[in-house]
Structure formats: C-alpha cells, structure tokens
C-alpha cells in the first residue's frame, strides 16, 4: 500500500514537471494582444487617447528644437542651404510615422520574441520531458527492497516534494503574470519615448526604450532556457540509484529554477544594455 501511495505521489510530481514545461512555454510565448484581449484593448485605448496627444506635443517641441539647432549652428544664419530644410521635413515625417505606428512597431518586437520562444519550446519539450512509466518502474525495484519505516519516510518525502513543486508552480505563475503586467505598462507609454527618436540629444530616450522592449521580448527565451535546463537536470537526477538523494535534488533544482526565473529580467536588460 505504501509503495502504491509513493508511486501515486511520484506520478503526480513528474506529471507536474512535464506539464510545467508546456504551460510555461504557452504563457511565455503569448504576445500582449494574445495573452488577454480585454487588457490589450484597454491599454491600446489609453495609449491612443491619452499618451499619443502628449507624444504629439513632444514631437512639436523636439522638431522645433531640432530646426532652431540646425539653423543656428550654421554660422549664425549666414551659412544656410535649402537641403537642411528637406532633411528637417524628412525627420518630421519619420517622427510622425513612428508615433502613429507605435503599436505596429511594438507588436513586431513581441512577434519576434514569440517566434523565438515557440522554436525553443519545441526543442525543450521534445528533449526534456520525463518518461514517467520508465522512471517509476526503475524506482519500484529500489522501493521493493526497503523496509516499512523507510517506505513511510519516503512517502512523506514525496508528499513534501510534491507540495514544494506546487508552491514553486504558483511562484512561477506570479513571475509570468508579473512579466506580462510589466509589458503592458511598458507598451502603454510607448508613443512618448518613440516621439523623441528623431532628435540627436533626446533620441537616447527612445533608443533605451526599444532596448528595454527587446529585453522584455527575449526574457521569454531566457525563461525557456531556465526551464529546459531544469527539466534536463531533473530527468538526470530521477534515475539515480539513491531515491532519497534524487528527490531532494528535485527540490533543490526547483528552488534554483524559481530563483533563476526571478533573475531573467535583469539578465535580459543587461544583455541589451537597457537601463
């Protein structure tokens, strides 16, 4: 009876590990428009109705500043040519185009990120899922040689480890949802930094914003890498001869996974040099 209970706990635990890989891949691979249509429409409405008018004011200021700078830097108005005005009109057209197509640009960035995550999910899910039946069969041989006391201790261990995995799953869900909320907040204010990109001095605001956007998009890939490493390590530890050691390794790797997921955001920003 104890062996049957332990096998049931192990089956549930390994099933959770396999499902977690697929669940995280599905969550991380979502774009802002696909994750929650209602939230996306609200954010888009706020951006277009509240932020875009402010971005228009910023464009006006930036373009006026740009025109004054272009004129005054030419020897106090004595050395001027008509070409600078064509250049200014081109900058103005580009700036207006970028602001009016901000959401297309932002969604394109996350479409790239989604494509990368989807490709990674296929590789990770195919190579890192645990063969539950084979693993349980291998463990059954070791459990049949254990006494009642050791089996009772092992059953408690499996119960605790299974509970630990469920808690970690909740924390991972919090991380994933927190990332999506951060994405929505970042997207909502997109027109303002984009409006500064036509100016040499102010353009760093928009450039840094795009870096942060790419960091958020590719954070999903880093999350998939962490999950893939976790699943492969778990798969290797499960087949260990010492069942107790294998179970505690599962717990240790789960804690490491959760810590690694918390670090993916700062790592992605560091890679893209986003402040």
Map each language-model feature to its residues.
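Binding/recognition "hotspot" determinant
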Residues: 1-58
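Alpha-helical transmembrane segments and their helix-start/interface "positive-inside/aromatic belt" motifs
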Residues: 1-6, 80-98, 102, 206-215
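Alpha-helical membrane-interface segments at transmembrane helix boundaries
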Residues: 43-52, 83, 87-90, 144, ...
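Juxtamembrane "helix exit" motif at the C-terminal ends of alpha-helical transmembrane segments
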Residues: 56, 60-72, 223-238
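Hydrophobic transmembrane alpha-helix segments characteristic of membrane transport
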Residues: 58-94, 189-203
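Non-cytosolic segments of integral membrane proteins
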Residues: 93-189, 223, 227-272
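Alpha-helical transmembrane segments
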Residues: 194-211, 239-240, 270-273
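Alpha-helical transmembrane segments of multi-pass membrane proteins
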Residues: 212-224
């Amino acid at each position: 009876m104890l062996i049957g209970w332990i096998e049931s706990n192990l089956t549930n635990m390994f099933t959770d590990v396999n499902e977690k890989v697929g669940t995280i891949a599905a969550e991380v691979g979502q774009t802002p428009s696909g994750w929650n249509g209602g939230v996306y429409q609200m954010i888009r409405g706020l951006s277009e109705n509240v932020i875009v008018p402010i971005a228009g004011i910023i464009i006006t200021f930036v373009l006026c500043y740009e025109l004054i700078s272009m004129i005054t830097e030419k020897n106090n108005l004595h050395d001027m040519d008509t070409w600078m005005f064509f250049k200014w009109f081109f900058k103005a057209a580009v700036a207006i185009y970028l602001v009016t197509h901000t959401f297309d640009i932002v969604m394109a960035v996350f479409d790239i990120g989604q494509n990368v995550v989807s490709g990674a999910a296929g590789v990770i899910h195919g190579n890192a899922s645990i063969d539950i039946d084979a693993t349980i069969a291998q463990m059954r041989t070791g459990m049949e040689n254990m006494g009642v006391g050791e089996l009772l201790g092992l059953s408690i261990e499996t119960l605790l480890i299974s509970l630990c995995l469920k808690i970690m799953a909740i924390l991972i869900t919090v991380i994933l949802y927190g990332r999506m909320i951060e994405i929505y907040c970042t997207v909502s204010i997109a027109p303002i930094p984009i409006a500064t990109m036509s100016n040499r001095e102010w353009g760093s605001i928009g450039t840094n914003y795009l870096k942060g956007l790419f960091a958020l998009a590719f954070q999903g890939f880093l999350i998939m890498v962490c999950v893939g490493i976790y699943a492969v390590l778990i798969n290797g530890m499960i087949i260990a001869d010492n069942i107790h050691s294998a179970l505690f390794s599962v717990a240790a790797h789960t804690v490491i996974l959760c810590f690694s997921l918390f670090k993916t955001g700062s790592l992605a920003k560091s890679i893209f040099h986003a402040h």
